[in-house]
Amino acid sequence: MEQVKLPFRADIVGSFLRPERLKKARKDFESGLLSPAALQQIEDEEIEKLIAEQKVVGLQVITDGEFRRSWWHLDFFWGLGGIEKKAVGQGYVFHNLETRPESVKVTGKITGYNHPMIAHFRFIQKLAGQAIPKQTIP
């Protein structure tokens, strides 16, 4: 495939709009209607579709769209050893909208051992083909 030189540059941060199927699956999971394995299966399928679309349009760098995350930063922190998810009194306020009241609490030495995002990266890496897999970390 011939690569076209464009008169501009664009970077993909990594986050794509979540498909309705994935949004529904997350709600069902939070309500206890969907198991962790069933949620992961839906995430995997939607990520596979997204990566295929990125390849079709010729992107050289692909991402999972952050489809497994509910926050771009807190999900990463919650995967570290020595960090716990913490409920707080108020969420972040941005343009008069309040987010979920969640944060982090340091409970011990911080480690990255067995961080779940390593498996997430390996999943997109095996689908990348000739493209470069990209994962956003804070």
Kindly give the residue locations of the regions a language model identified.
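Domain-level signal for soluble alpha/beta catalytic cores
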Residues: 1-138
